[in-house]
Protein backbone atom coordinates (compact mmCIF):
# COMPACT_ATOMS: atom_id res chain seq x y z
CA UNK A 1 0.00 0.00 0.00
CA UNK A 2 1.16 3.54 -0.72
CA UNK A 3 1.62 5.94 2.17
CA UNK A 4 -0.79 8.86 2.05
CA UNK A 5 0.65 11.98 0.46
CA UNK A 6 0.20 14.16 3.55
CA UNK A 7 1.02 14.14 7.26
CA UNK A 8 -0.35 16.09 10.20
CA UNK A 9 1.69 17.58 13.04
CA UNK A 10 0.65 19.30 16.22
CA UNK A 11 3.23 22.02 15.62
CA UNK A 12 2.73 22.92 11.96
CA UNK A 13 -0.58 21.40 10.88
CA UNK A 14 -0.78 19.63 7.52
CA UNK A 15 2.27 19.10 5.33
CA UNK A 16 3.09 17.03 2.28
CA UNK A 17 4.65 13.70 3.22
CA UNK A 18 7.99 14.61 1.63
CA UNK A 19 8.42 17.62 3.93
CA UNK A 20 11.19 17.19 6.56
CA UNK A 21 9.53 17.31 9.99
CA UNK A 22 11.98 15.85 12.51
CA UNK A 23 15.27 17.43 13.52
CA UNK A 24 18.54 15.57 13.14
CA UNK A 25 19.12 15.98 16.87
CA UNK A 26 15.90 14.10 17.67
CA UNK A 27 16.94 11.21 15.45
CA UNK A 28 20.48 11.03 16.83
CA UNK A 29 19.79 11.43 20.54
CA UNK A 30 16.76 9.19 20.89
CA UNK A 31 16.63 6.58 18.11
CA UNK A 32 14.00 3.95 18.78
CA UNK A 33 12.58 5.61 21.90
CA UNK A 34 9.86 7.78 20.40
CA UNK A 35 6.41 6.77 21.75
CA UNK A 36 4.14 5.52 19.00
CA UNK A 37 0.77 3.88 18.46
CA UNK A 38 -0.95 2.52 15.37
CA UNK A 39 -4.72 2.63 14.94
CA UNK A 40 -7.40 2.49 12.24
CA UNK A 41 -9.27 5.69 11.43
CA UNK A 42 -12.51 6.23 9.55
CA UNK A 43 -13.41 9.75 8.35
CA UNK A 44 -16.28 11.18 10.34
CA UNK A 45 -15.52 9.08 13.43
CA UNK A 46 -13.29 10.71 16.05
CA UNK A 47 -10.56 8.49 17.59
CA UNK A 48 -10.51 8.01 21.37
CA UNK A 49 -7.92 10.72 21.96
CA UNK A 50 -7.88 10.35 25.74
CA UNK A 51 -7.07 6.63 25.59
CA UNK A 52 -4.40 7.19 22.93
CA UNK A 53 -2.79 9.99 24.94
CA UNK A 54 -2.61 7.80 28.06
CA UNK A 55 -1.06 4.97 26.05
CA UNK A 56 1.61 7.27 24.59
CA UNK A 57 2.24 9.06 27.89
CA UNK A 58 3.16 5.85 29.72
CA UNK A 59 6.14 5.12 27.47
CA UNK A 60 7.01 8.83 27.21
CA UNK A 61 7.24 9.06 30.99
CA UNK A 62 9.31 5.87 31.16
CA UNK A 63 11.90 7.13 28.67
CA UNK A 64 11.84 10.76 29.82
CA UNK A 65 10.27 12.04 26.60
CA UNK A 66 8.40 15.35 26.70
CA UNK A 67 4.73 14.64 26.04
CA UNK A 68 2.64 17.25 24.18
CA UNK A 69 -0.69 18.28 25.67
CA UNK A 70 -3.70 16.16 24.81
CA UNK A 71 -5.16 19.08 22.84
CA UNK A 72 -2.19 18.88 20.46
CA UNK A 73 -2.81 15.19 19.85
CA UNK A 74 -6.50 15.84 19.25
CA UNK A 75 -5.76 18.61 16.75
CA UNK A 76 -3.22 16.56 14.81
CA UNK A 77 -5.61 13.61 14.55
CA UNK A 78 -8.58 15.81 13.61
CA UNK A 79 -6.58 17.60 10.92
CA UNK A 80 -5.48 14.24 9.53
CA UNK A 81 -8.93 12.64 9.41
CA UNK A 82 -10.48 15.79 7.93
CA UNK A 83 -7.84 15.89 5.20
CA UNK A 84 -8.25 12.16 4.58
CA UNK A 85 -11.95 12.68 3.91
CA UNK A 86 -11.33 15.77 1.77
CA UNK A 87 -8.81 14.02 -0.47
CA UNK A 88 -10.03 10.42 -0.47
CA UNK A 89 -13.64 10.41 0.71
CA UNK A 90 -14.82 7.76 3.20
CA UNK A 91 -11.54 5.82 2.98
CA UNK A 92 -10.33 3.83 5.98
CA UNK A 93 -6.65 4.24 6.83
CA UNK A 94 -4.20 2.83 9.32
CA UNK A 95 -2.53 5.71 11.11
CA UNK A 96 0.76 5.89 12.97
CA UNK A 97 1.08 8.50 15.70
CA UNK A 98 4.62 9.32 16.87
CA UNK A 99 5.73 11.68 19.63
CA UNK A 100 9.03 13.27 18.61
CA UNK A 101 10.63 16.67 19.16
CA UNK A 102 7.86 17.50 21.68
CA UNK A 103 5.23 17.30 18.95
CA UNK A 104 2.80 14.77 17.51
CA UNK A 105 3.36 13.50 13.97
CA UNK A 106 0.53 11.59 12.27
CA UNK A 107 0.97 9.66 9.02
CA UNK A 108 -1.13 6.97 7.41
CA UNK A 109 -1.75 4.39 4.72
CA UNK A 110 -5.09 3.44 3.12
CA UNK A 111 -6.30 -0.05 4.01
CA UNK A 112 -9.08 -2.49 3.16
CA UNK A 113 -10.41 -3.31 6.64
CA UNK A 114 -12.01 -6.59 5.50
CA UNK A 115 -9.91 -8.92 3.36
CA UNK A 116 -10.97 -12.16 1.70
CA UNK A 117 -7.53 -13.80 1.57
CA UNK A 118 -7.28 -16.55 4.23
CA UNK A 119 -4.17 -16.70 6.39
CA UNK A 120 -2.30 -19.51 8.11
CA UNK A 121 -1.07 -18.98 11.67
CA UNK A 122 1.69 -20.94 13.36
CA UNK A 123 1.56 -22.32 16.88
CA UNK A 124 4.18 -21.25 19.41
CA UNK A 125 4.98 -21.26 23.11
CA UNK A 126 3.92 -18.39 25.32
CA UNK A 127 6.72 -15.79 25.35
CA UNK A 128 8.30 -15.30 28.79
CA UNK A 129 7.10 -12.26 30.75
CA UNK A 130 8.86 -9.14 29.52
CA UNK A 131 10.55 -6.74 31.95
CA UNK A 132 8.94 -3.32 32.15
CA UNK A 133 11.57 -1.65 29.97
CA UNK A 134 10.87 -4.06 27.12
CA UNK A 135 7.12 -3.60 27.49
CA UNK A 136 7.60 0.16 27.17
CA UNK A 137 10.08 -0.24 24.30
CA UNK A 138 7.42 -2.19 22.40
CA UNK A 139 5.34 1.01 22.45
CA UNK A 140 8.06 3.04 20.72
CA UNK A 141 9.58 3.24 17.26
CA UNK A 142 11.99 0.44 18.24
CA UNK A 143 10.43 -2.29 16.06
CA UNK A 144 13.39 -4.59 15.40
CA UNK A 145 11.93 -7.54 17.33
CA UNK A 146 8.55 -7.26 15.60
CA UNK A 147 10.10 -6.98 12.15
CA UNK A 148 12.29 -10.02 12.78
CA UNK A 149 9.27 -12.04 13.92
CA UNK A 150 7.32 -10.97 10.82
CA UNK A 151 10.17 -12.03 8.52
CA UNK A 152 10.65 -15.40 10.20
CA UNK A 153 6.94 -16.22 10.08
CA UNK A 154 6.57 -15.06 6.48
CA UNK A 155 9.45 -17.35 5.55
CA UNK A 156 7.43 -20.35 6.74
CA UNK A 157 4.19 -19.18 5.10
CA UNK A 158 2.56 -17.85 8.26
CA UNK A 159 1.09 -14.43 8.97
CA UNK A 160 1.40 -14.70 12.76
CA UNK A 161 1.93 -17.16 15.60
CA UNK A 162 -0.51 -18.06 18.38
CA UNK A 163 0.67 -19.30 21.80
CA UNK A 164 -0.93 -22.68 22.52
CA UNK A 165 0.47 -23.57 25.94
CA UNK A 166 -1.73 -25.92 28.00
CA UNK A 167 -3.81 -26.57 24.90
CA UNK A 168 -5.38 -23.09 24.84
CA UNK A 169 -5.19 -20.28 22.28
CA UNK A 170 -3.49 -17.09 23.46
CA UNK A 171 -3.11 -13.60 22.03
CA UNK A 172 -1.15 -13.72 18.73
CA UNK A 173 2.39 -12.35 18.75
CA UNK A 174 1.68 -9.66 16.14
CA UNK A 175 -2.05 -9.13 15.70
CA UNK A 176 -5.30 -10.30 17.27
CA UNK A 177 -7.94 -13.01 16.86
CA UNK A 178 -11.72 -12.81 16.64
CA UNK A 179 -13.34 -16.19 17.28
CA UNK A 180 -16.88 -17.49 16.96
CA UNK A 181 -17.83 -19.76 19.86
CA UNK A 182 -21.13 -21.30 21.02
CA UNK A 183 -21.21 -18.65 23.75
CA UNK A 184 -20.73 -15.73 21.37
CA UNK A 185 -17.90 -13.95 19.59
CA UNK A 186 -14.64 -13.53 21.54
CA UNK A 187 -11.69 -11.30 20.66
CA UNK A 188 -8.15 -12.18 21.81
CA UNK A 189 -6.00 -9.05 21.99
CA UNK A 190 -8.05 -6.50 23.89
CA UNK A 191 -5.89 -3.41 23.28
CA UNK A 192 -5.69 -3.83 19.49
CA UNK A 193 -9.32 -4.87 19.13
CA UNK A 194 -10.41 -1.96 21.31
CA UNK A 195 -8.93 0.41 18.72
CA UNK A 196 -10.68 -1.52 15.96
CA UNK A 197 -13.97 -1.13 17.84
CA UNK A 198 -13.36 2.58 18.47
CA UNK A 199 -13.15 3.04 14.69
CA UNK A 200 -16.49 1.28 14.25
CA UNK A 201 -14.85 -1.73 12.58
CA UNK A 202 -15.76 -4.31 15.26
CA UNK A 203 -19.21 -4.88 16.72
CA UNK A 204 -19.84 -4.07 20.36
CA UNK A 205 -21.16 -7.57 21.11
CA UNK A 206 -17.69 -9.13 20.79
CA UNK A 207 -16.15 -9.89 24.20
CA UNK A 208 -12.60 -8.52 24.32
CA UNK A 209 -10.08 -10.37 26.46
CA UNK A 210 -6.46 -11.48 26.76
CA UNK A 211 -7.44 -14.70 28.57
CA UNK A 212 -6.63 -17.99 26.77
CA UNK A 213 -9.44 -19.64 24.84
CA UNK A 214 -10.26 -23.33 24.46
CA UNK A 215 -9.59 -24.30 20.79
CA UNK A 216 -12.43 -26.82 20.72
CA UNK A 217 -14.88 -23.98 21.36
CA UNK A 218 -13.82 -22.07 18.24
CA UNK A 219 -16.04 -22.70 15.23
CA UNK A 220 -14.58 -19.95 13.04
CA UNK A 221 -11.79 -17.42 13.39
CA UNK A 222 -10.50 -14.19 11.86
CA UNK A 223 -7.07 -12.63 12.22
CA UNK A 224 -6.64 -8.87 12.65
CA UNK A 225 -3.25 -7.84 11.30
CA UNK A 226 -0.99 -5.12 12.75
CA UNK A 227 -2.41 -2.94 9.93
CA UNK A 228 -5.95 -3.61 11.21
CA UNK A 229 -6.98 -5.61 8.17
CA UNK A 230 -9.19 -8.59 9.06
CA UNK A 231 -8.60 -11.93 7.28
CA UNK A 232 -10.35 -15.29 7.64
CA UNK A 233 -8.14 -17.85 9.39
CA UNK A 234 -7.55 -21.06 7.44
CA UNK A 235 -5.47 -22.76 10.13
CA UNK A 236 -3.66 -22.38 13.44
CA UNK A 237 -1.08 -25.13 13.33
CA UNK A 238 -3.01 -28.34 12.70
CA UNK A 239 -6.34 -26.71 13.58
CA UNK A 240 -8.30 -25.97 10.42
CA UNK A 241 -11.61 -24.29 9.64
What are these regions (language model features)?
Residues 1-162, 181-185, 192-241:
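Conserved alpha/beta cores of soluble small-molecule-handling proteins
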Residues 164-171, 224:
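Short, composition-biased local secondary-structure segments
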Residues 168-189:
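Glycine- and Gly-Pro-enriched alpha-helical subdomains that act as flexible
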Amino acid sequence: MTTLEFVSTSADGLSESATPLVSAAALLTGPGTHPTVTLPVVPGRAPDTEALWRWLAESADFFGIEMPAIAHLRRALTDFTDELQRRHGPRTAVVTVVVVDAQVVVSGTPISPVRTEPVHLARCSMPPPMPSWRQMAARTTSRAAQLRTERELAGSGHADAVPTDSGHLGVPLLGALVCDTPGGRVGLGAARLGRLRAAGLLDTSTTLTDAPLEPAAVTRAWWVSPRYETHPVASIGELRW
